[in-house]
């Protein structure tokens, strides 16, 4: 009995010791650990990461230097202007041509929380229309993106938006990237960007 108890305690301690913790991937000071792709504006102001359309009104991305396969990402965002943004995952980039999948961040009525495949199949899944109420446009929102194997789940302000199983996503690899859509007129603030590798 004592041996079983000892082994049980040892197993629990090992799990606790090796369990991954969420870590911040934005230090609130500069863009260390990230790479700017394109000519659009990415800068830090008062501890917040800001993306803003530049004079070229083109696509722009801020990608992590590290690649992430299976993870649970949380962040906060606030939209200060009309326009489309998003969080790419398991992605690769050539200039400003990005391949991979995007968890949508957009104005009301534009599928925030949905999953879009860039240069591929397009929209894979959109949230049900009534879930649009969970987005607080012009205010701080909490976004959660969990990617494990071939499954993707998104939440906005604690509400599940979509759950998707997709074989192609399961085979994907690459970095995480924040997006500025082309067309101009975009400004989004981001903060508290944390990731737990799974």
Please give the residue ranges for each predicted region:
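Bacterial Sec-dependent N-terminal signal peptides
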Residues: 1-21
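Carbohydrate-interacting regions of secretory-pathway proteins
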Residues: 20-198
């Amino acid at each position: 009995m004592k041996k079983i108890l000892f082994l049980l305690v040892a197993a629990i301690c090992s799990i606790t010791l090796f369990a991954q913790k969420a870590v911040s991937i934005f230090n609130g000071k500069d863009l260390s650990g990230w790479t700017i792709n394109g000519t659009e504006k990415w800068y830090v102001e008062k501890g917040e990461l800001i993306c803003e359309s530049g004079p070229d009104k083109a696509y722009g991305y801020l990608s992590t230097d590290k690649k992430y396969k299976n993870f649970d990402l949380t962040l906060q965002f606030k939209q200060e202007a009309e326009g489309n943004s998003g969080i790419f995952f398991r992605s690769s980039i050539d200039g400003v041509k990005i391949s991979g999948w995007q968890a949508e961040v957009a104005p009301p009525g534009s599928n925030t929380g949905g999953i879009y495949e860039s240069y591929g199949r397009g929209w894979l899944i959109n949230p049900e229309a009534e879930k649009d109420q969970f987005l607080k446009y012009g205010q701080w929102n909490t976004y959660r993106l969990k990617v494990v194997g071939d499954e993707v789940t998104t939440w906005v302000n604690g509400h599940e938006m979509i759950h998707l199983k997709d074989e192609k996503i399961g085979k994907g690899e690459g970095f995480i990237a924040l997006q500025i859509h082309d067309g101009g007129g975009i400004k989004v603030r981001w903060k508290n960007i944390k990731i737990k590798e799974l």
